[in-house]
Amino acid sequence: MPVDPEKLAKLQKASVAKKVGGSRVKAKKNVKTEQDDTKLIEALGKLKAQKIEGIEEANFFKEDGKVLHFNRVGVQGAAQHNTFALTGYPQEKDVTQLIPQILPQLGAENLEILRKLAEQIQAGKNPELNAGGAEGAEEDIPDLIEGQKFDDVE
């Protein structure tokens, strides 16, 4: 089959202007947190967890003095498995911000803890970070002498 050079030049010129195909842009996968929620719901379903009503808020106290505060919290529990799930959006706050809200909820047995907390806030130090606090806890531990039994030490 003979090739006509004029037609070939015309086709080549036309093909330069047209772009067939192109670079493929891969679709970005959208990872949703709903997958985690469905896994959690399935796990709680296997444990036969039931929704617990009447809990309006929850507070988790951290060692550094901060508090994870859940204003609106959903609670599900499976008492036979000793498993409870708290769901919601936490806010990290200082203990001092939450004291007015926590005071009415505490009973008389917690007044001593509140006094200690107030002293810590006024003093501006944390007893766990203080080396003297660790030494005070070790005073109750007896020293063992070589050759003595643990039960014999008083």
From Swiss-Prot:
Every NAC-A/B domain range: 34-99
Query: Which region ranges are annotated with the description Disordered?
Result: 125-154
GO annotations of cellular component type: cytoplasm; nucleus
Where the protein is mainly located, per its record?
Answer: cytoplasm
Indicate where this protein resides in the cell. Cytoplasm; Nucleus
In terms of PROSITE patterns, this protein maps to: NAC_AB
Q: Where are the transmembrane segments?
A: none
Keyword terms: Cytoplasm, Nucleus, Protein transport, Repressor, Transcription, Transcription regulation, Transport
**Quaternary structure note:** Part of the nascent polypeptide-associated complex (NAC), consisting of EGD2 and EGD1. NAC associates with ribosomes via EGD1.
Family affiliation = Belongs to the NAC-beta family.
* Biological role stated in the UniProt entry: Component of the nascent polypeptide-associated complex (NAC), a dynamic component of the ribosomal exit tunnel, protecting the emerging polypeptides from interaction with other cytoplasmic proteins to ensure appropriate nascent protein targeting. The NAC complex also promotes mitochondrial protein import by enhancing productive ribosome interactions with the outer mitochondrial membrane and blocks the inappropriate interaction of ribosomes translating non-secretory nascent polypeptides with translocation sites in the membrane of the endoplasmic reticulum.
User: Any idea what this protein is called?
Assistant: Nascent polypeptide-associated complex subunit beta
